[in-house]
Amino acid sequence: MPAILSRVAPRTFNLVGSRLMASAARLETVPREEIHKEYDRKKTFYHRDLEIQLAGPTQLKTKPLDPTKLKFGHTYADYMMTCDWDAERGWHHPKIEPIGELKIHPGAKVLHYASELFEGMKAYRGIDNKIRMFRPEMNMARMKRTALRAALPDFDSEEMINVLTELLRLDQEWVPNSDVCSLYLRPTLIGTDPTLGVGCATEAKMFVITGPVGAYYSTGFQPVSLLADSRFIRAFPGGVGAYKMGCNYAPTIWVGKEAASKNCQQVLWLYGENEDLTEVGTMNIFLFWKNEEGDMELITPPLHRGLILPGVTRDSLLELGREWGEYKVTERTLNMEEVKKALSEKRLYEMFGSGTACVVSPVGKILYHNKVTDEYEELHIPTMSSKFGVMQKFYNTINDIQYGRIIKDGWMRDI
């Protein structure tokens, strides 16, 4: 059976099988029967097809001397991953190349109809100097669900994780040697076909950029104040609040400015006549209290209504809380009236957000707009003075897992 030949350019590497092979003037061969048997580019791109263009000396950037002082999202590493898709051919070969600008037509779907989704994940340099990703399978599963909802192309999670691993190997010097810093990864999928009119994208681009990020709390935990006003809604049943799409974030910016004008750092998103709690800022929300039955309980809103992004950190905290067995762990709807009642009865001990950026974020105050009186009420949350230390234990444990001080089976992926 004849072989299919593929030539790659000088200073480019091609992945066939499991490792890099130099290809300055080299032909790689893959048996045609293997292609027919295993390749289906309508379904996914493949790690084995990965092409890597190495950066020249002038393209490599100076790394920050003190990563703890980095501002989130302002510094990028040397490389990025890209992979194109079109409806006729399916996925093209994935590529890793020096980071640079994308060329996109002004009529691209993403620019007009927000045909887009993204993920946020991190890689950590452990105390043993090994680099690991935190639960990447969960990020990829969520990204695939979002792609389906956005009518963008599907892909295989393991193929994507393997490509991310190669990207991290090239950018490994950008992973800070610090137990409070990390390398942030932003996988993104956009519709790119240059046609106006609402409809399914016939062309798309996957890309991944990375960058080092400092400690979220450089001087220790800083409790945040929340604006809670049910006149502003983040998500609704049947919508896309449970998916990581850019269209969920842009409409929240103005509300965030309103919160800042009232000396609040985040928004506590409420929903419905009962003012159900959903999210805090871009984080999931947790409460630790004594419930009305007298049980100590960790509680967070449920996912079933589609109002809440299923956070990786959220899932991790729930799993740890249930493993510890020190209190009841519950996912159920809760509303502002319950919060106010628990505060008045002094049985609400801690409230905190959870997310990739910070692990946990303590809440110190809620500025609540009372829709009956049309006045604002200040509700003080005793998170920082809590004797139970539930939030702190979560932070310490997740941090220890991420940096390799604690081994948690299946949670960290070595690169």
Swiss-Prot record:
GO CC, any one term: mitochondrion
N6-(pyridoxal phosphate)lysine: modified positions: K244
Keyword Hydrolase: no
Location(s) in or outside the cell: Cytoplasm
EC number per UniProt: 2.6.1.42
Main location: cytoplasm
Catalytic activity: L-leucine + 2-oxoglutarate = 4-methyl-2-oxopentanoate + L-glutamate; L-isoleucine + 2-oxoglutarate = (S)-3-methyl-2-oxopentanoate + L-glutamate; L-valine + 2-oxoglutarate = 3-methyl-2-oxobutanoate + L-glutamate
InterPro entries for the chain: Aminotrans_IV, Aminotrans_IV_CS, Aminotransferase-like, B_amino_transII, BCAT-like_C, BCAT-like_N, BCAT_family
PROSITE patterns: AA_TRANSFER_CLASS_4
A Pfam family this chain is assigned to: Aminotran_4
The protein, known as: Branched-chain-amino-acid aminotransferase, cytosolic
GO aspect biological process, one term: L-leucine biosynthetic process
Keywords: Amino-acid biosynthesis, Aminotransferase, Branched-chain amino acid biosynthesis, Cytoplasm, Pyridoxal phosphate, Transferase
Cofactor(s) it depends on: pyridoxal 5'-phosphate
Gene: bcat-1
CDD domains found in the cross-reference section: BCAT_beta_family (cd01557)
Disruption-associated phenotype: RNAi-mediated knockdown extends mean lifespan by 25% and maximum lifespan by 19%, increases maximum moving speed, and increases levels of the enzyme substrates, L-leucine, L-isoleucine and L-valine.
Similarity field: Belongs to the class-IV pyridoxal-phosphate-dependent aminotransferase family.
Function, as annotated: Catalyzes the first reaction in the catabolism of the essential branched chain amino acids leucine, isoleucine, and valine.
Gene Ontology molecular function, alphabetical: branched-chain-amino-acid transaminase activity; L-isoleucine-2-oxoglutarate transaminase activity; L-leucine-2-oxoglutarate transaminase activity; L-valine-2-oxoglutarate transaminase activity
PANTHER family: BRANCHED-CHAIN-AMINO-ACID AMINOTRANSFERASE, SUBGROUP IIII AMINOTRANSFERASE
